[in-house]
């Protein structure tokens, strides 16, 4: 099993900071943002990690992270030219991931739960991780059946969310993920959407979900970047 960190994008919501570096290299409390998804994957036991990023600041990632030896890991780097969506960025890793299952995490997502058991138990299909939030309409939102347990579909940033849960930026996929991505069509904004990929798995009754209990931080805006630093500081002070 390989880990994949998607760390591309322009980081426009964090301008002007991201004019000089990739947002995933910005500090969150006492370390660069990208260290957190690396730690999430390492905690699971994954040491082969593919990092997808844009061409402009790729050298900064290499200078900071190197080969991965300092982490006890092996890093692979893949360049994404332009913005084609999360699923498109994921597709670029096929040549390295091969026929293995993958754990995918967005580079600006900080997840403090230990999800190693869910990954250890994973056999086939896909897993998404949900978190109850006060503003689900900013994210992909799961729609459940009458019992509130059976997952019916996932809606991308709905105006009227049908649940209080958000789909976080942590996913587990089996080896069929790349063939499924090839079946996707660009959305209205011209991108291959991760929500469409997850719905493909759901259509085949191969999508499971787990609910995160601990903090989930999306550090992609100034407000959330600041809040993430506060939460990390509080967590560390209690250890």
Task: Label the model's feature ranges.
Residues 2-5, 13-16, 27, 31-106, ...:
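Conserved N-terminal catalytic core of the sugar/cofactor nucleotidyltransferase
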Residues 8, 54-55, 80-81, 106-108, ...:
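Fold-independent oxyanion-binding glycine-rich loops
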Residues 19-24:
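Short alpha-helical oligomerization interface
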Residues 25, 142-144, 209:
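A structural signal for short hydrophobic beta-strand segments in well-ordered beta-sheet cores
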Residues 66-72, 143-146, 200-202:
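Short, conserved catalytic or adaptor-binding loops enriched in Gly and charged residues
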């Amino acid at each position: 099993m390989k880990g994949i960190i998607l760390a591309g994008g322009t980081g426009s919501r964090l301008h002007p900071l991201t004019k000089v570096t990739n947002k995933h290299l910005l500090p969150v409390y006492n370390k660069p943002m990208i260290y957190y998804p690396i730690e999430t994957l390492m905690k699971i036991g994954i040491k082969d990690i593919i990092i997808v990023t844009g061409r402009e600041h790729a050298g900064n990632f290499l200078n900071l992270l190197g080969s991965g030896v300092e982490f006890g890991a092996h890093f692979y780097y893949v360049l994404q030219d332009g913005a084609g969506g999360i699923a498109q960025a994921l597709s670029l890793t096929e040549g390295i991931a091969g026929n293995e299952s993958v754990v995918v995490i967005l580079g600006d997502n900080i997840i403090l739960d230990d999800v190693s058991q869910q990954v250890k138990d994973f056999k086939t299909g896909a897993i998404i991780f949900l978190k109850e939030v006060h503003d689900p309409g900013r994210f992909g939102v799961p729609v459940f059946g009458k019992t509130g347990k059976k997952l019916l579909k996932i809606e991308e940033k709905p105006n009227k969310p049908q649940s209080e849960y958000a789909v976080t930026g942590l996913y587990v996929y089996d080896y069929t993920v790349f063939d499924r991505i090839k079946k996707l069509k660009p959305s209205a904004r011209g991108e291959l959407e991760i929500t469409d990929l997850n719905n493909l798995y759901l259509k085949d009754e191969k999508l499971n979900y787990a609910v995160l209990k601990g903090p989930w931080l999306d550090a992609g805006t100034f407000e959330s970047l600041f809040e993430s630093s506060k939460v990390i500081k509080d967590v560390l002070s209690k250890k």
